[in-house]
UniProtKB/Swiss-Prot annotation:
One cellular component (GO) term of this entry: cytosol
Keyword Cytoplasm: yes
Protein name: Argininosuccinate lyase
Protein's gene: argH
Cell compartment(s), UniProt: Cytoplasm
Source organism per UniProt: Escherichia fergusonii (strain ATCC 35469 / DSM 13698 / CCUG 18766 / IAM 14443 / JCM 21226 / LMG 7866 / NBRC 102419 / NCTC 12128 / CDC 0568-73)
The protein's annotated pathway: Amino-acid biosynthesis; L-arginine biosynthesis; L-arginine from L-ornithine and carbamoyl phosphate: step 3/3
InterPro entries: Arg_succ_lyase_C, Argininosuccinate_lyase, Fumarase/histidase_N, Fumarate_lyase_CS, Fumarate_lyase_fam, Fumarate_lyase_N, L-Aspartase-like
Entry-linked Pfam families: ASL_C2, Lyase_1
Length: 457
């Protein structure tokens, strides 16, 4: 059934109807639409539109419909209703007859859909927060199990300084913690109810909107009706959080894809998250990680698309706003799926410690330690930097690591170098010296793990 029509003398062209209808995607708001309708029926009692008995009859019918939708959601898509609001109202009228036609009194689809979408967003943010924290916990557990797995850290994809696999895991815990904070922050601004704002100017019925907001679980009601039906900031904020979160997951995926290559060989992924080749029998492809990396683009696109949709819209509601849902649904679904998949990748990952250690010992990753050693001997850092650069060139020429150059060779570059330099150049010394907060020393990594465990509970 259509919720409008008296003004028109011709039926809508079928092609326009298909173009205009939104049920194929806003069916996902069915539960929220029904819950919002129950609350609205209670509000209508307070202003004398419904009797208490009528409200009970409507609420009972709506609750039956809610259970029916939860049991068989696919039934919605069997309808040719224009949108989810039309579908719910049509089903309600089928159940209670003329009484169902009173429910929309004082309400517009403009404030109705804004309310539905905010309720959906609140539910989805809760799911995202749970999945985010589960991935953080998986990373912390992996870190705890790999505190002694020394590996090269990279800048410019060149070996730079030794780190540990645990320290690498904890870097992504920090990123995910910021993602968690962004979601929680967005939820604060999202948690206001637009229901009762009507089409744009507010409702003509003296409904207590704060009470109505409380019935729906919102912290408060919105303050301006024009803004309330026009506002899609919460969509932009969640898309932005998703875009940033997916960038973090994409970087996580790219790191592990590289670590998993034959050239690096730092990790081996579980068979449960890899696939083979139809031609090459030896292949074990990191498809789960590649898909996480690939799906990042569609989420960035959803954010950009929504920004462009909103940028030129006048107040208040415009049909353009119907375009807010598909991108949002897809982006948050994608983010949620990727959070779950990233946790699955960590479940069963094998860190190849000997290969990690071997790589950490290559590439002159201890060169900075030699420079710091010279500084401790009174050599200005800039001069020490130059001296070590020359020493590295000589070590490369001889095909040796720095620690295998004899003292006589090292002293050609600086006479302050003594026998005490060799312990300084060990991998363990490189790690131990990074003992400032946030560093890679075993003590700092252990503290970071303990802090994350306490925060995650």
């Amino acid at each position: 059934m259509a919720l409008w029509g008296g003004r028109f003398t011709q039926a809508a062209d079928q092609r326009f109807k298909q173009f205009n209808d939104s049920l194929r995607f806003d069916y996902r708001l069915a539960e929220q639409d029904i819950v919002g309708s129950v609350a609205w029926s209670k509000a209508l009692v307070t202003v004398g539109v419904l009797t208490a008995e009528e409200q009970v009859q409507l609420e009972e019918a709506l609750n039956v419909l809610l259970e029916d939708v939860r049991a068989r959601p696919q039934q919605i898509l069997e309808s040719d209703a224009e949108d989810i609001h039309s579908w719910v109202e049509g089903k309600l009228i089928d159940k209670v007859g003329q009484l169902g036609k009173k429910l929309h009194t004082g309400r517009s689809r403009n404030d109705q859909v804004a309310t539905d979408l905010k309720l959906w967003c609140k539910d989805t943010v809760s799911e995202l927060l749970t999945a985010n924290r589960q991935l953080q916990s998986a990373l912390v557990e992996t870190a705890e199990n790999n505190q002694d797995a020394v590996m090269p850290g990279y800048t410019h994809l060149q070996r730079a300084q030794p780190v540990t696999f645990a320290h690498w895991c904890l870097a992504y815990v920090e990123m995910l913690a910021r993602d968690e904070s962004r979601l929680q922050d967005a939820l604060k601004r999202l948690d206001v109810s637009p229901l009762g704002c009507g089409a744009l100017a507010g409702t003509a019925y003296e409904i207590d909107r704060e009470q109505l907001a409380g019935w729906l679980g919102f912290a408060s009601a919105t303050r301006n009706s024009l803004d309330s039906v026009s506002d899609r900031d919460h969509v932009l904020e969640l898309l932005s959080a998703a875009a940033i979160g997916m960038v973090h997951l994409s970087r996580f995926a790219e790191d592990l894809i590289f670590f998993n290559t034959g050239e690096a060989g730092f990790v081996e992924l579980s068979d449960r998250v890899t696939s083979g080749s139809s031609l090459m029998p030896q292949k074990k492809n990191p498809d789960a990680l590649e898909l996480i990396r690939g799906k990042c683009g569609r989420v960035q696109g959803a954010l950009t698309g929504m920004m462009m949709t909103l940028k030129g819209l006048p107040l208040a509601y415009n049909k353009d706003m119907q375009e807010d849902k598909e991108g949002l649904f897809d982006a948050l679904d994608t983010w949620l799926d990727c959070l779950h998949m990233a946790a699955l990748v960590l479940d069963g990952i094998q860190v190849k410690r000997p290969r990690c250690q071997e790589a950490a010992q290559q590439g002159y990753a201890n060169a900075t330690e030699l420079a710091d050693y010279l500084v401790a001997k009174g050599v200005p850092f800039r001069e020490a930097h130059h001296i070590v650069g020359e020493a590295v060139v000589e070590a490369i020429r001889q095909g040796k690591p720095l620690e295998e150059l004899p003292l006589s060779e090292l002293q050609k570059f600086s006479q302050v170098i003594g026998e005490d330099v060799y312990p300084i150049l060990s991998l363990q010394s490189c790690l131990d010296k990074r003992a400032a907060k946030g560093g890679v020393s075993p003590q700092q990594v252990a503290q970071a793990i303990a802090f994350a465990q306490a925060r995650l509970g």
